[in-house]
Curated annotation (Swiss-Prot):
NCBIfam families with a match to the protein in the record: ileS (TIGR00392)
Keywords, sorted A to Z: Aminoacyl-tRNA synthetase, ATP-binding, Cytoplasm, Ligase, Metal-binding, Nucleotide-binding, Protein biosynthesis, Zinc
Subcellular location: Cytoplasm
One BP annotation, GO: isoleucyl-tRNA aminoacylation
Gene Ontology terms, MF aspect: aminoacyl-tRNA deacylase activity; ATP binding; isoleucine-tRNA ligase activity; tRNA binding; zinc ion binding
Motif interval(s): 'HIGH' region: 59-69
Database matches in Gene3D superfamilies: HUPs (3.40.50.620), Isoleucyl-tRNA Synthetase, Domain 1 (1.10.730.10)
Reported function: Catalyzes the attachment of isoleucine to tRNA(Ile). As IleRS can inadvertently accommodate and process structurally similar amino acids such as valine, to avoid such errors it has two additional distinct tRNA(Ile)-dependent editing activities. One activity is designated as 'pretransfer' editing and involves the hydrolysis of activated Val-AMP. The other activity is designated 'posttransfer' editing and involves deacylation of mischarged Val-tRNA(Ile).
UniProt motif 'KMSKS' region: location: 619-623
Binding positions (ATP): 622
Protein name, entry field: Isoleucine--tRNA ligase
Any single GO CC term annotated in Swiss-Prot or TrEMBL for this entry: cytoplasm
Cofactor(s) this protein requires: Zn(2+)
Organism the protein comes from: Nocardia farcinica (strain IFM 10152)
Length: 1042
């Protein structure tokens, strides 16, 4: 053909040309989808079909999306696209997480609020209005971002956790749990955010970045023992029990000290005469303080100390009932500290349990903001961390401080504000997870985890140790805890509500807003109070926002008030995906609530991917600039390139991924460019449209069709088990075979417009773009529509196995041919023998070499040799070497492993016909050794991958071979000259060559080769007219169109 205008393609033109940049093409596709409403059509096309239920975890919309959202979003698009093409209906409702601390923190920033008291002064209505306006601040940016990544979601039918219907379903869930006896109010020590003035759940302290390195003071403090005269250890009277703590601020609240009953303790006299009591194992740790002349006076078990009294370091709570005694506690260790533990039950869970068991009620000298109250006058108003240095100073002044040091340790922080937490006893509402924990473990066995090890590992272990879940937050913006209690303890009553109808029944009004303060205004007289004076008032707490996101499967459809039949038949969901940290977050809360409410898993399959890291291997940071800007990548390389980079990576198998610009660009070369090049090649040479055909008898056509059939099966199998990276590898391997083998080796057939070749490539591209559609949705759309003229590849069906002829034997053999050629070409490169220089011979030595006989001509042409010699006698050209893996073999063979190693080094080993290896009379297992095929002449020989055989290259260059190589080099230069003159690849030309005397005979000998390759109708040797191209070696060429 003369030019692109004669081409049969594209049938649908995006107006960008074959040389367009991928980002430009992508934008045109996105515009076409929007105009055509293609996404909606993909749903409607499957009306009445079996449904694939996908849960889209709701992000917070008051922050901008990042790489983590991008990665997860691509997975959330690949699987639904694939399932849609497989004939399923896949609704994809987008959701928004609207409640909780993220919204409140954003509102506080906007309003200039730095303290909770300012919210009370402002009024809850105004503050929550600000929260509501902030939560959907970035929905427009999210929509643009999601659209640009070519992710199809339903924004118009989205769900929001602040919607009345959603909140009513959450209320129903709470009431259902309460009715099952799985909700209770308790007073427990919990992770507490003094900054946000609310407790957190234990799983929230296990989220990524919850623990950070922090420096804190550590003090060793004296507590003087008081021992009655009749006690067996009366000599301890006046001795100092030593405690060690990293929270000096808890010392004013000390109510007990604890020892381990079975640990050995000592009474010693320091060099200065002061007497101390501590664990024997910890004495050496304080040798500097005790002095060289310290003397152990007595040694005894901790049990002997139990019951003794002592004087606390501060006297704020002297006389507290049953306090200031030595208690026994099995959790006391001697790994650090002194082996004597200071106990402030308001600030330690284990402290609280032990003190409670010994009838010691806690004292709470902190306000909700973590500041000391008037119960400890010297420190009143000080925040706990600010109080540390003041307390330490007072201890030192009182002579009670033995040691003061600074330690750096991993410490929990609020996952939202980033402020360090404290542990504090607070009243909270709990889901009694421990009552059904074993059932959660059982139901987890029904879930398919990707990667599989998370099921019994990270998630399974977490379930086994699951604790009751604190679901209440002392905050403002969230779903209310639907509990009303009497305001007079003389007439106690508790009412729990599970629907708007129930609220309307008791309060006479149907709420239109369940948020505070509107819901708090619902009050009524206490029916159990005959005086009529007490009122039923709602408890002030709101629900943990994780309770809401864990409720999304049913709350998004307003279950059980609507869509009950639909939900019952579509639960559990088929698939969810998030990063693996959600084993402590969304995955966990979904599983807890589904188990408790429905005795079922919430999902059948879950993919838990790794973390995206910056190009330095560290967490992505704007300030460090250690990652490429997403929008810049979209503009430079395109969304498909980014999608390929992320989807083909180990991150989808649980590993982490370092994002680099180079890695993203490799996605272009690995997948996009090969498919695009094959498509532009077809456009260039097909003057008539190709047809769907799979009956060509040409070996290359048969091979590529069979290779495609194999790829179809491999990709189908991979995507069915959510192995997206595996599907990418299948497609990458095929794209390489298509462009670097089939198209390149078929060029001459296309030049003559061989219909078998055109039809085969048309068919291959039509199927390949359907296979690539979920992984490369934008470029696949351009190619498929240009090829077929159809509406969208995403409305097409996934290729069926019966569509393509399978021939695994041909694929295997041809792939071996390709491997042989690649090995020979690598050998040529190592010896600096350019491919255009013909060589005499290559020998292929392999046990199955004869199967390559029908393809010897292909090998010869590909590697440019005159002859291909096939032999099964590998031993002539090389030998196998064995290496023993001592680490693997040692546990089984014991001392014999050295005897085996010695025998192998001496060459005393054998391999039977069925592949069993023995050495020194001992059979080795496959994992206990490695074999390597070693060439007898390494300079001219290379081993095939997998020790499959050897290739031996005759590298002797005769003058005849050199002459032909020179001619082929000349052809390449003349082709470049044609190109520089703007000639079409099919244009015929007249050429005059001016060749130096030394090379004239070579030119004459290879006249036909030169003329044929450059499409010269006439080729003359003489003086080249002007203008003439200056070529290598003094050759000049005059070229004009025939």
């Amino acid at each position: 053909m003369a030019d692109d205008s004669n081409s049969a393609y594209p049938r649908v033109d995006y107006g960008a040309g074959t040389g367009a940049a991928f980002p430009d093409l992508e934008r045109r596709v996105l515009e076409a989808w929007a105009a055509d409403d293609t996404f909606r059509a993909s749903i409607e096309n499957r009306s009445g079909a079996a449904e694939f239920v996908f849960y889209d975890g709701p992000p917070f919309a008051n922050g901008l999306p990042h790489y983590g959202h991008l990665l997860t979003g691509y997975v959330k698009d690949v699987i639904p696209r694939f399932q849609t093409m497989r004939g399923k209906r896949v609704d994809r409702r987008f959701g928004w997480d609207c409640h909780g601390l993220p919204a409140e923190i954003e509102a506080e920033k906007q309003l200039g609020i730095t303290d909770k008291s300012q919210i009370d002064a402002m009024g809850l209505a105004e503050f929550n209005a600000a929260c509501k306006s902030s939560v959907l601040r970035y929905t427009g940016e999210w929509r643009d971002y999601v659209t640009r990544q070519a992710r199809w979601v339903d924004f118009d039918n989205d769900y929001k956790t602040l919607d009345l219907d959603f909140m009513e379903s959450v209320m129903w869930a709470f009431k259902s749990l309460y009715d099952k006896g799985l909700i209770y109010q308790g007073f427990r020590v919990l992770p507490y955010s003094w900054y946000e003035q609310t407790p957190l759940s234990n799983q929230e302290t296990r989220l990524d970045d919850a623990y950070k390195m922090r420096q804190d003071p550590a003090v060793t403090v004296d507590m003087v023992l008081s021992v009655p005269g009749e006690h067996p250890l009366r000599e301890l009277d006046g001795a100092n029990a030593l405690i060690w703590t990293t929270t000096p601020w808890t010392l004013p609240s000390n109510l007990a000290i604890a020892v381990h009953p079975d640990v050995r303790y000592v009474h010693l006299r320091a060099a200065d005469g002061t007497r101390y009591v501590l664990a024997a194992e910890r004495v050496s740790h304080y040798s500097r303080e005790f002095g060289e002349d310290a003397t152990v006076l007595a040694e005894f078990e901790g049990a002997a100390l139990v019951g003794l009294s002592y004087r606390p370091p501060f006297d704020f709570f002297l006389g507290h009932p049953n306090a200031h005694r030595v208690l026994a506690a099995d959790y006391v260790t001697t790994d650090s500290g002194t082996g004597v533990v200071h106990m402030a039950p308001a600030f330690g869970e284990e402290d609280m349990e032990v003190c409670s068991a010994n009838d010691i009620e806690l004292v709470q000298p902190l306000d909700p903001g973590g500041r000391f109250t008037s119960m400890v006058p010297p420190y009143e108003g000080l925040m706990v961390f600010d109080a540390n240095p003041v307390i330490i100073k007072d201890l030192k002044a009182a002579g009670k401080l033995l040691r003061h040091e600074t330690i750096e340790h991993s410490y929990p922080h609020s996952w939202r504000s980033g402020q360090p937490l404290i542990y504090m006893a607070v009243p909270s509402w709990f889901v009694a997870v421990t009552k059904f924990r074993d059932r959660m473990v059982e139901l987890n066995k029904q879930i398919t985890w990707v990667p599989e090890h998370i099921r019994d590992g990270q998630f399974g272990k977490w379930l086994e140790g699951a604790r009751d879940w604190n679901i209440s937050r002392n905050r403002y913006w969230g779903s209310p805890i639907p509990v009303w209690v009497s305001d007079d303890p003389a007439y106690p009553r508790v009412d729990v509500y599970g629907s708007l109808e129930e609220l309307e029944r008791d309060f006479g009004v149907r709420p239109t807003d369940l948020h505070r303060p509107a819901i708090d205004q619902l009050t009524r007289p206490n029916p159990d109070d005959p005086t009529g004076r007490s009122m039923m008032r709602r408890v002030p707490e709101v629900l943990d926002c994780w309770f809401e996101s864990g409720s999304m499967p049913y709350a998004q459809v307003h279950y059980p008030f609507e869509n009950k039949e639909w939900f019952d038949s579509h639960f559990p969901g088929d698939f969810i995906v998030e990063y693996n940290g959600q084993t402590r977050g969304w995955f966990y809360t979904l599983h807890v609530l589904a188990t408790a409410l429905f005795d079922s898993p919430a999902f059948k399959t879950v993919a838990a991917h790794g973390i995206v890291l910056g190009d330095d291997g560290l967490k992505m940071s704007k300030s460090k600039g250690n990652y490429p800007d997403v929008n810049e990548v979209f503009d430079r390389d395109g969304s498909d390139a980014m999608r390929w980079f992320l989807m083909s990576s180990p991150i989808l198998r649980g590993g982490n991924l370092i994002v680099t610009e180079r890695g993203i660009r490799e996605g272009v070369s690995h997948a996009l460019r090969p498919l695009w090049n094959a498509w532009t090649f077809l456009q260039l040479y097909a003057s008539k449209p190709g047809e769907w055909r799979t009956d060509s008898t040409h070996v290359l056509d048969r091979y590529i069709l069979a290779k495609l059939a194999q790829t179809r099966d491999g990709m189908t199998e991979a995507l069915e088990v959510y192995d997206i990276a595996g599907a990418c590898e299948e497609l990458r391997t095929f794209a390489d075979a298509l462009t670097n083998w089939y198209v390149r080796r078929s060029r001459s057939r296309f030049w003559s417009e061989d219909r078998d070749a055109v039809d085969t490539l048309h068919t291959v591209l039509e199927v390949a773009t359907r296979l690539a559609a979920p992984l490369l949705p934008l470029i696949s759309e351009v190619i498929w529509r240009g090829l077929t003229g159809g509406r969208s590849v995403h409305l097409a069906d996934w290729p069926a196995a019966a569509d393509l002829p399978a021939d695994p034997e041909l694929v295997s053999t041809m792939d071996e041919v390709r491997t042989v050629c690649s090995t020979v070409l690598s050998l040529r490169k190592a010896k600096n023998l350019r491919v255009r220089l013909p060589l005499a011979e290559v020998t292929i030595a392999a046990p199955d070499a004869e199967r390559l006989a029908p393809y010897a001509d292909i090998v010869a042409d590909e590697v440019n040799v005159k002859k291909v010699d096939l032999t099964t006698d590998v031993a002539v050209h090389g030998r196998f070497e064995l290496a023993v893996n001592a680490r693997a073999a040692g546990p089984r063979l014991g001392k014999d492993v050295q005897r085996v190693i010695k025998a192998v080094k001496a060459g005393d080993w054998t391999e039977s016909a069925d592949g069993v290896v023995s050495a020194a009379g001992i059979t080795l297992l496959p994992e206990e050794y490695t074999q390597r095929l070693v060439a007898a002449e390494p300079e001219s020989t290379a081993a095939l991958p997998g020790n499959a055989g050897l290739v031996v290259l005759d590298s002797v260059v005769t003058e005849e071979l050199e002459a032909e190589g020179w001619a082929r080099d000349l052809v390449r230069e003349l082709q470049e000259t044609r190109k520089s003159l703007g000639l079409d690849v099919s244009d015929r030309i007249h050429v005059v060559l001016e060749v130096p005397e030394a090379r004239r005979s070579w030119a004459q000998t290879h006249r036909d080769l030169i003329a044929g390759e450059i499409l010269a109708t006439s080729l003359e040797f003489g003086t080249a007219g002007e203008p003439a191209a200056e070529l290598a070696g003094g050759v000049r060429a005059s070229v004009r169109k025939a």
